[in-house]
Amino acid sequence: CELTNITIAVEREECELCITVNATWCSGYCFTRDPVYKYPPVSEVQQTCTFKEVVYETVKIPGCRDHAESLYSYPVATECHCETCDTDSTDCTVRGLGPSYCSFNQ
């Protein structure tokens, strides 16, 4: 479980444009187990590689309409660890759109 360089697309609806930025995020493996002997039944807590600390960086998205907010802040991981996934701050599934998804045609 370690910091990894990623490229993400950022957008604002008012600007009708996506730009890509480089950031760091957490990626890798965490020790996990699924015991063969399951009696008595005990639920196993799976851990995922997730951020321990983040900072927010801000970029200006060009081409925004009059008086539209053109600044966009995004999280950048500075430290990683293995922990139970916190669904309040993290997409813990594989259902997300992915970091390079953009709503607008480029």
From Swiss-Prot:
Claim: Disulfide bond is one of the keywords in the record: yes
GO terms for MF: follicle-stimulating hormone activity
One Gene Ontology biological process: G protein-coupled receptor signaling pathway
Signal peptide: none
Cysteines paired by S-S bonds: 1-49, 15-64, 18-102, 26-80, 30-82, 85-92
Record keywords: Disulfide bond, Glycoprotein, Hormone, Secreted
InterPro entries recorded: Cystine-knot_cytokine, Glyco_hormone_CN, Gonadotropin_bsu, Gonadotropin_bsu_CS
Entry's localization field: Secreted
Name this polypeptide is given: Follitropin subunit beta
Source species: Struthio camelus
